[in-house]
């Protein structure tokens, strides 16, 4: 968390938590989508 605060000195905990959650959800959705495409292609 200290590293994040160094990069974004103006960010507070709520903003950082929301951003990390959004990034994680996007990565999870993309990986799930690619997995479904591979299953459908077989």
Curated annotation (Swiss-Prot):
InterPro entries: PetM_cyt_b6/f_cplx_su7. It is a single-pass membrane protein. It holds the Pfam family PetM. One of its GO terms (molecular function) is electron transfer activity. Its main location: plastid. Keywords: Chloroplast, Electron transport, Membrane, Photosynthesis, Plastid, Thylakoid, Transmembrane, Transmembrane helix, Transport. GO terms for biological process: photosynthesis. The keyword Iron does not apply. Belongs to the PetM family. Component of the cytochrome b6-f complex, which mediates electron transfer between photosystem II (PSII) and photosystem I (PSI), cyclic electron flow around PSI, and state transitions. This is Cytochrome b6-f complex subunit 7. It comes from Trieres chinensis. The gene is petM.
């Amino acid at each position: 968390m200290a590293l994040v605060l160094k990069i974004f000195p103006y960010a507070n905990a709520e903003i950082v938590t929301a951003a990390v959650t959004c990034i994680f959800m996007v990565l999870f959705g993309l990986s799930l989508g690619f997995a479904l495409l591979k299953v459908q292609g077989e």
